[in-house]
Amino acid sequence: SANAKIAEGFLCDANGPANGKDASGVEFSCTKGGDGKYSWRSKQTSNSGSGSSIFSLGALGSKCSKEGEIGWNGLLVAACKSGVVKYALVSDVPATPASGYTSRPTWYPTLTQILGGPSGIEPTCSPSTIKFTKPVIALDKLAPSIPYGMMVSDHVTPIDHAYLGVISLAIPQASRTANDYIAVTAPADGVITELSSLGSPSSHRVVINHGCNIYSVYMVLNKATGVLADSFSKLSNNGFMSLSIPIKAGEEFGRQRDNMLDFNIFDGTQWLSGFANPYSYLTQDTWKPYTADYLPLFTDDIRAGMEKQLQRTSAPRIGKIDQDVIGAAAGNWFLAGTNGYGGNLTSAYENTTVQVPGGSVSGKNTYAWSHLAIARHEVDTSKWILSTGWYKDSKGDPVQFLINLTAGQVAPDKLTASSGAMVYTLSQFSYIFPAGTPARVDGSSEPYPVGYTLGSGTSVGSVILQVNSDNSLSIEFASTFTSDKRTYKR
């Protein structure tokens, strides 16, 4: 029955009914969480009324009395405008300080608000009390791993997670058996709060709350097993499960064989200072500024084993995703007229009283169509990558190119308004393996070796960049600006 699909935490259709009742008659609202997904939340916690005893602002469209007030309403950052709760726009929040934010601005939601749900309780203990005493992948099963910050396909901006390699990837796909699956285990005690499908029978997401503001996240997990076996057997019916399953350090919750395992840590007490405009991440991936280095959490022996397999050999070994240089070309950019990471036009947020769906943009091939990043490569940090969601197709055709700096040419992190327009040549890039690297097995998908570097490949033409006096960036894939010039903002 339809009611069977309505339950706390189950996914709902953003374009379907806004309210519903479960089999017991409890009322739920279809609400958007900080992860961009819509799920059923009880009306007692979804803050669907005109006010709230927990949050200063109510739901979109409800009445408010404190003009200009900005705050979290349980689902999003809102503002009181002319007595009505509306989306907070970038013009409503304070401008980023010249030196950037070194800690969370008061208007930005906490990690607990983002990942803990509307009824989440802020922890009072310190993250320093959490220690990862078990590996996620047994060290003898771990293969070379990609650090934070890769730019690939429609992951246009540097990715906020690592990819842990597994030795089964060295086996040709056609030769892999059930015995080649490798256990994925919890690094510390915690509570599994989410199991969801990423759209494929062999790709899942798991979130573990370790307490004290530390969360670990795992994606493209091939199988959910162990303590998640029962939940996994029911997952196909709804695609998303909000859970509360205790797990101990070293306890298995999944198996991996056919791809690298996405892994990262969020720490609600840390803040990445290298984002020039944190507001841009309110529309999707709101957790991004809380991305933290997982290496210090592990015991020394496990840390050493994981570091040994990280492809990047320069500090920080885990990589860096926040590469914005205020006043220069380096870092993340979003097409002028769009509202940050979500990819929708700002106009979609201005007067709406319903939540703007996340994860896709109507009429576009990808939400990242409006993204642009000019950042150092995640492994070979001597090389600069231009990553764009819109190359030739305005609907979105994400691609990454190597920027070939010539002698005396200003690097992107030094390209400022005073530099004027700068033309860079772009090329495909090749991978150069360290001497003595064994030949790759045909049909395998083993990760590239630790310490590889990039070489310049086939030329793809030029790009012209100019930082403007208002700190926006003009770009065109040509050697001179024409009417096709685009402008991006932070």
Roles of regions detected by a PLM:
Residues L261-S280:
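Short, compositionally biased
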Residues N3-S99:
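Tryptophan-rich substrate-binding surfaces of secreted polymer-degrading and adhesive proteins
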Residues G100-H204, C212, A224, K248-A249, ...:
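Surface-exposed, glycine-biased beta-strand/turn segments
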Residues M219-S244:
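Aromatic/His-enriched, Gly/Pro-containing loop or helix-boundary segments
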Residues D13, S65, W72, T185, ...:
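Hydrophobic beta-strand signal
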Residues S370-R490:
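Contiguous, well-ordered beta-strand patches that form the walls/edges
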